[in-house]
């Protein structure tokens, strides 16, 4: 979304708000129509729910940073079907960025290929024993330097008992707007792609480094359990990954259009 230049600068606050609301509504509606086109069972009457977006502000111009968790030698979790978390995270993150870019939201990715980010800024000559710490620190540094207004970190879950399944969102306790963003993503997941999902959002503990050390609205989306055969089979499917990306993108768009997101 290009908000620069005299035409936009010369708008009064009310006009800017209307403009931003229109753009953010377009994002949400476009995403939901994409979901229908992909055949994920989103009923037409449900799409109308997303047309009513709260009055927006020019805060919907904020950069959204999408963080594909893990990467490179850090593969994250793995499934019995051979799926690696790092690969799925990157794939879904790229789809989210594509959807947001098409609709005019400035979306940036912490990584666009299969690598850790510990040496992104070349701070040390020797990262032995420090790779994971610097990888996480640099993801936050990237978001800060991008002047991000929101951070969405994409991950996969795994548990030693295979019966657990479903998407779940964790939110940073450091910004009041993290929780509404998490709630919207969780809500849309249940409505549009996981009707059986009864999980609730959770406040991130201090063990989740990125959620602990950021001050901007931030959520971590555990898209499913690689330890669950059903989830793993879905996550191996390209169409289902697109459904996840559309769900997250549409939820983020409606959140961006809310007046609370501007605070």
Regions found by a protein language model. Give the residues of each.
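Catalytic-site microenvironment of enzymes
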Residues: 1-263
């Amino acid at each position: 979304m290009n908000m620069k230049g005299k035409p936009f600068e010369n708008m009064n606050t009310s006009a800017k708000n209307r403009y931003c609301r229109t753009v953010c509504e377009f994002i949400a509606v476009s995403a939901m129509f994409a979901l229908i086109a992909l055949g994920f069972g989103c009923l037409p009457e449900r799409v109308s729910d997303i047309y009513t977006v709260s009055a927006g502000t020019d805060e919907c111009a904020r950069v959204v940073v999408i963080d594909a968790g893990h990467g490179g030698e850090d593969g994250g979790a793995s499934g019995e079907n051979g799926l690696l978390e790092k690969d799925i995270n990157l794939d879904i993150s790229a789809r989210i960025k594509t959807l947001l870019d098409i609709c005019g939201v400035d979306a940036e990715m912490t990584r666009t290929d299969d690598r850790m980010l510990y040496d992104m800024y070349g701070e040390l000559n020797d990262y032995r024993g420090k790779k994971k710490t610097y990888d996480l620190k640099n993801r936050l540094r990237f978001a800060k330097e991008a002047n991000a207004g929101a951070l969405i970190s994409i991950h996969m879950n795994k548990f030693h008992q295979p019966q657990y399944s479903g998407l779940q969102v964790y939110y940073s306790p450091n910004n009041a707007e993290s929780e509404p963003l998490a709630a919207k993503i969780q809500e849309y997941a249940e409505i549009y792609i996981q009707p059986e999902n009864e999980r609730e959002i959770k406040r991130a503990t201090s063990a989740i480094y990125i959620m602990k050390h950021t001050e901007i609205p931030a959520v971590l989306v555990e898209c499913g359990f690689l330890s669950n055969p059903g989830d793993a089979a879905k996550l191996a499917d390209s169409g289902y990954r697109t459904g996840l990306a559309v769900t997250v993108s549409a939820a983020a768009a409606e959140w961006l259009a809310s007046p609370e997101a501007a605070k």
